[in-house]
């Protein structure tokens, strides 16, 4: 049987890894796919690719690959929202299947892209867009297809996890660790997407759509970064038996879908709380399987290439199948996607960690307890430290039971108005992940 011909657009870290894996494991991949896979053309701008290329035609124009009549599958690895969107739509228009590792593209333009792919009867595969080398999309879309998914939670950005691990283990401040992450290549020169939760929100949007059968709605995801976290809060959380992780949470409720990325206290004895460094993990709770955990490298040349090539093998296997019988892009049949609303963060329910800096005066705790009680907020535990020598302020740390966020917001306004409370109240959400 003739080999399937693919074109790779983008030969950076992931593109170079993909080319290397395809060359190194060509025989094994052909045995799995049922046909050989040949790289027929590469589009790249760099003069210093991350692999050795001999004999493969090269172009600087990605659209040349999308229009090449010899190519069956286009692998999009250029990143970004704009040119990548145009490239993928052009490839689909020309009847080519697409494999991509572009989470931003899928989260923002996925609904449009999938509709066009259905119209043209082609496949768009995107396992590598979420959690690098962890096949979590396949696990949710296929392995857990018997389940009604209740919730999922994930550490899905390695940069943020590296920073929080260093802050906890070595007592280092956020700016110091961020600088090291940039020097090591874990964070970009502009780290906004990583440290403000945007990258994780792209990935969470994709996972939530597959888990709950809803359209992609990245614009409704709540994002909160880790730039304001201090070593003090990391240490207080540890003393209370928790660890702070930058967590993406998607939960099905009677009112709608929670879709949120933010710093989160997790009990230290949970497996996911012990995922450290640049590693990723996603926990999924289904009504039949219960809780399952998927762990591995969330980025990197070959881990991500593993998912790209895995998708490529799946596409080759499915190329001759009836399009109506293929696994749907978002796990559910397109006409069965639900219109569940995405809840605003104020309507989401969580337990909370609150840190209050108070003057060392009698009666402050009673005032704090009264404000919380008036708003139906129950206190689970309180930790009060000695007054700090420099300013004489007493750090007061509280853990609450679960409550709607709007109630906490109202309580914080009242707490910050107290004469004996100084500065802003620190608020971090708590998830038990039972």
Regions found by a protein language model. Give the residues of each.
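Rossmann-fold NAD(P)-binding glycine/threonine-rich loop
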Residues: 84-94, 103-141
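Low-complexity, glycine/alanine/valine/leucine- and proline-rich hydrophobic stretches
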Residues: 262-287, 301-302, 373, 378-391
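A short hydrophobic/small-residue beta-strand
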Residues: 97-99, 379
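General beta-strand structural signal in soluble alpha/beta enzymes
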Residues: 58-60, 67, 75-76, 99-101, ...
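N-terminal glycine-/serine-/threonine-rich beta1-alpha1-beta2 phosphate-ribose binding loop
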Residues: 1-94
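A conserved regulatory-domain signal marking ACT and ACT-like small-molecule sensing domains
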Residues: 307, 312, 316-434
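Rossmann-like NAD(P)H-binding beta-loop-alpha module
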Residues: 118-199, 206
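Substrate-binding/catalytic subdomain of NAD(P)-dependent oxidoreductase enzymes
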Residues: 176-274, 279-281, 300
